[in-house]
Each structure stands twice: as C-alpha cells, then as structure tokens.
Curated annotation (Swiss-Prot):
GO molecular function terms noted in the UniProt entry: DNA-binding transcription factor activity; transcription cis-regulatory region binding
The name this protein goes by in its record: Nucleoid occlusion factor SlmA
Function: Required for nucleoid occlusion (NO) phenomenon, which prevents Z-ring formation and cell division over the nucleoid. Acts as a DNA-associated cell division inhibitor that binds simultaneously chromosomal DNA and FtsZ, and disrupts the assembly of FtsZ polymers. SlmA-DNA-binding sequences (SBS) are dispersed on non-Ter regions of the chromosome, preventing FtsZ polymerization at these regions.
Organismal lineage: Bacteria, Pseudomonadati, Pseudomonadota, Gammaproteobacteria, Enterobacterales
Coiled-coil ranges from the UniProt annotation: 117-144
Biological processes, Gene Ontology terms: cell division; negative regulation of division septum assembly
Length: 198
C-alpha cells in the first residue's frame, strides 16, 4: 500500500515538473493543453486526471509550492537577520533568485501562464504578492522599534516600491524569454534601491 502511495506521489510530482518545464519552454507562452502535458509526461489524458481532477488543480499545486517556498524562506530571513536594510535586501534577492532558478514558475508569478486559465488562479498570485508586500511593510515599520529611528517616507509607499522593482525584474525575465536574469547586476542595483529607503 505504501509503495502504491509513493508511486502516485512520484507521478504527481512528475506531472508538475513536466508542467513547469513546459512553462519554461516556448510552449509556456501559449496555452498548455492537457493533451500536450500528457504527451510530455508520456501518459494518457485520463491518467493525468487520475492524479489531478483538473488542470486548474495542477496550477494550484504549483502555486502552493511557490507560496510555501517563498513564505518559509522569508520567515527564516526574519528569524536570522535583525538589520532592517539587510532583511529587505535578502527578501528582494530571494524573490529575484527564486524566479531565476524557476523560470517556468516565474511565468505563473507574472501571470503570463495564467492568462488562459481560471481567474481564481491569478487571484491566488495576487494574494501572495499582497502577503509579501505586507511583510515588507512590517519590516519597514519595525525599524523604529528595532533601531530607534524610522523612515521619513511612508512605509506603504516604500514596500510597494520594493515589490514593484521585483515584479518588474521578473516580468523583464519572462519578456526576454529568460535572457535577462533578475539577479544580474544586483549588487550594482541594490544601492539605487536602498537609496530610496529614507
């Protein structure tokens, strides 16, 4: 019985990995059908539906992976790092690095892969970005408590600026067909971003 569950879990992971790879390829700029996905995995469409009730559920699983990966790592950054600017830098670098290491998933983050799918999926991505922005805002607000001095600019504005930078770099990565990596020249860009944090 345990062997059967492991095989089922492995097949589910294989399906999700194939979907992510298809999103990374030129297929990712077009609607991905279950027929194409089944052919990529080497199974029938019926076999896909034995593991996932719908293609939407496949995207849900990929979004869950994205959420878990990012939120877990953000929490680790907040636990380990106490300096506000260092926290912000690490969170921004995390978002950019995650996108760079997972190009197919970046198409989901930017919404490109979800254009032909249910609106609910885009809503989940919107919620994820809202959570990240709220976390950035909280880090910015905690500066006054941690370091005795806050920012002169509204923390809401600063948080949205940081997130807009991340979203812009991820969109550029997708638009360039993954040529312009989000972390390229990050060490030169960060001082420009940090200079806005006043």
């Amino acid at each position: 019985m345990a062997e059967k569950q492991t095989a089922k879990r492995n097949r589910r992971e294989e399906i999700l990995q194939s979907l992510a790879l298809m999103l990374e390829s030129s297929d990712g700029s077009q609607r991905i059908t279950t027929a194409k996905l089944a052919a990529s995995v080497g199974v029938s469409e019926a076999a896909l539906y034995r593991h996932f009730p719908s293609k939407t559920r496949m995207f849900d699983s990929l979004i869950e992976f994205i959420e878990d990966s990012l939120i877990t790592r953000i929490n680790l950054i907040l636990k380990d790092e106490k300096d506000t600017t260092a926290r912000l830098r690490l969170i921004v670098l995390l978002l950019l690095g995650f996108g760079e290491r997972n190009p197919g998933l970046t198409r989901i983050l930017t919404g490109h892969a979800l254009m032909f799918e249910q609106d609910r999926l885009q809503g989940r991505i919107n919620q994820l970005f809202e959570r990240i922005e709220a976390q950035l805002r909280q880090v910015l607000r905690e500066k006054r408590m941690r370091e005795g001095e806050g920012y002169t600019t509204d923390e809401t504005l600063l948080a949205s600026q940081l997130l807009a930078f991340c979203e812009g770099m991820l969109s550029r990565f997708v638009r360039s067909e993954f040529k312009y990596r989000p972390t390229d020249d990050f060490d030169a860009r960060w001082p420009l971003i940090a200079a806005q944090l006043q």
